[in-house]
Amino acid sequence: MVNPTFTDGEDSFAGWNTEANDGASFSTGGVAEIMKIARGKNGSFDINQTLTDLTNGIYMMSINGLFLSGGDIYSEFNAGQFYMNNTYNYAMTSSEDIIAEADAQDQVNCLLSDDEEYKDGEELIGYVPSTFKGCSYAYNAGRYQNFCATEVTDGTLTIGMRSLGTGIEGDWLPFGNLHVYYLGNAEEANEKLAEVLDGFVARAQTIVNLIASDGYEGVTQRPNISNE
């Protein structure tokens, strides 16, 4: 894989194909000595790279990232995806890996000077990143880890990060710590794939626990959430 850390080239995206629509843009930032963060912003976009001459079998991607729609940390309107060939997983939203106030360690697993407070009414639940620097610390601590897996049958694997676009100004998909692993054939990969599935189950439970309140006015930001 070429430039998995997004540190090469004049714009840091050397080796990657980038497609931007509807005003989308790409950039990098963060705390370099902690973790470089790349991101796509606004509109719809696709950042991808195709690997060839690979051994056939099961491959897994691990990447830290989140999707923030319209600059709203409470939004569950998700258009961000991490993908491998025709398999994709939606990026976590801010609320899926809140660091609790009691567990927050400044400049270790969060950046209190930059992070936003996540509240339930007046009650502080914890903190979520909303800047490049905040993502560097959160991701380096293992927060917002996403997985995707697929089977390669022709020696070719395309990996990528994309947003389908929400039509809302301020969409943001920051990511880093990208790794791609070869897990072997289907039988050999079972144990590692179980970890991926466990991650999906944990995410599903988190989403179930985050039903929007009846008083929330931004219903367009949560089009798929119902408390029925």
For the regions a language model picked out, list residue spans one by one.
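Exposed low-complexity, polar/acidic, P/S/T/G-rich flexible segments that act as propeptides
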Residues: 168-190
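Short beta-strand-plus-loop segments that form exposed binding edges in beta-rich domains
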Residues: 133-138, 160-171
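Extra-cytoplasmic beta-strand recognition segments
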Residues: 6, 45-76, 147-151, 157-159, ...
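Amphipathic, heptad-repeat alpha-helical segments
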Residues: 187-228
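Extracellular ligand-binding interfaces
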Residues: 65-135
